[in-house]
């Protein structure tokens, strides 16, 4: 009798909730290095200009600025995607809002990267997906200063 009661309690707590169909979502965050193709440190003015251009082009809304008034986070009001410089202007971060369709996220990612790199290459920079910048020793180590 007690065994049946315990079995029923365990079933109700752990198994029964899995029987209900739930929607499945994925949230993706990607942080990619901005590389100076001249073998030098990343030029932060180039990084910031590329973000400002992408924010304007894709209709993102500015959210946060650093202590010097530079934009470092913006959000798409339709998709909820975020562009940001999390800790430094050496890496560009894209945070995609939760989605049930990874192909939609992939399409947006490709559009963002293509646009950003078309702008960055004009200043001999590029967003790379191959780990850290090979010139990390040359890059400035200062963090973005801002008050929350």
Region annotations inferred by a language model:
Residues 1-148:
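Terminal catalytic/cofactor-binding subdomain
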